[in-house]
Amino acid sequence: MTLSRDDAAQVAKVLSEALPYIRRFVGKTLVIKYGGNAMESEELKAGFARDVVLMKAVGINPVVVHGGGPQIGDLLKRLSIESHFIDGMRVTDAATMDVVEMVLGGQVNKDIVNLINRHGGSAIGLTGKDAELIRAKKLTVTRQTPEMTKPEIIDIGHVGEVTGVNVGLLNMLVKGDFIPVIAPIGVGSNGESYNINADLVAGKVAEALKAEKLMLLTNIAGLMDKQGQVLTGLSTEQVNELIADGTIYGGMLPKIRCALEAVQGGVTSAHIIDGRVPNAVLLEIFTDSGVGTLISNRKRH
């Protein structure tokens, strides 16, 4: 099939716009947190796999960290195990942790690996327990009301926070032309398993690798101002101001704090991108306009 003149011109424009970005990012590492709608639509899933394979083909090193909250919730429901959340975190007792490991490590992770490989990549699936990739400790959660003289410690079970990343393993895989796909399960000092927020794992992996970019796929268009307009480029100082004045609040706060910590920890830029947009990852990396919000220590994309 021959392209029309208009279609050919559009293809040429896209390729020429992408070329400077490809040159800039060759040999660089990009950590992508994959989740939300992008994991549910078959079209978006295929597009994500193609994006990752193309990045690797042009010399960029993608590392994928994935979520799987809805899939965990579905299996818990089928097993008649009730889900409880505190401050957005799933209370994870021993039975729930078994389900988390089954779903994230055994189902979701392998589905993503298989999808990338079917589109021409060489993906390898890992959990944080493999070669102690993600070392973790129990997350301490506290709560205090005006009536309390001291904070109350709340036990949320096998929920963890990252204490270390096996950078040597990831570098070995990346140099071997593999695409690491990581399930956010950490391992404690005694071999115990921890359920960790995927955004936090992605941020810590990006920091440890000194990645060029941390990309967080979400179900929103990006960070918005109080008028509902997407803020396309922000410095870390501007983000802190938006938190202070209440523009950023609620469920977005943990994600934004994760992005801020990554940039302050050595990642060149963090991106909050709309995973509902087909090929969102490529559009954010390889076009002038992008499809989300970029956070960096600089003012511009």
UniProtKB/Swiss-Prot annotation:
Family per similarity comment: Belongs to the acetylglutamate kinase family. ArgB subfamily.
Location relative to the cell: Cytoplasm
Cited function: Catalyzes the ATP-dependent phosphorylation of N-acetyl-L-glutamate.
ATP-binding keyword on record: yes
Involved pathway(s): Amino-acid biosynthesis; L-arginine biosynthesis; N(2)-acetyl-L-ornithine from L-glutamate: step 2/4
Gene3D superfamilies assigned: Acetylglutamate kinase-like
Reaction(s) catalysed (UniProt annotation): N-acetyl-L-glutamate + ATP = N-acetyl-L-glutamyl 5-phosphate + ADP
Enzyme superclass (EC): transferase
InterPro entries: AceGlu_kinase-like_sf (IPR036393), AcgluKinase_fam (IPR004662), ArgB (IPR037528), Asp/Glu/Uridylate_kinase (IPR001048), Glu/AcGlu_kinase (IPR001057), NAGK-C (IPR041727)
HAMAP family in the cross-refs: ArgB
PANTHER family: N-ACETYLGLUTAMATE SYNTHASE (PTHR23342), N-ACETYLGLUTAMATE SYNTHASE, MITOCHONDRIAL (PTHR23342:SF0)
Site (Transition state stabilizer): 33, 255
Single GO BP term: arginine biosynthetic process via ornithine
GO CC terms: cytoplasm
Domain of life of the organism encoding this protein: Bacteria
EC number: 2.7.2.8
Subunit structure: Homohexamer.
Pfam families assigned: AA_kinase
Protein's organism: Pseudomonas aeruginosa (strain ATCC 15692 / DSM 22644 / CIP 104116 / JCM 14847 / LMG 12228 / 1C / PRS 101 / PAO1)
Protein name: Acetylglutamate kinase
An MF annotation (GO) of this entry: acetylglutamate kinase activity
Record's keyword terms, sorted: Amino-acid biosynthesis, Arginine biosynthesis, ATP-binding, Cytoplasm, Kinase, Nucleotide-binding, Transferase
Residues annotated as binding substrate: 68-69, 90, 195
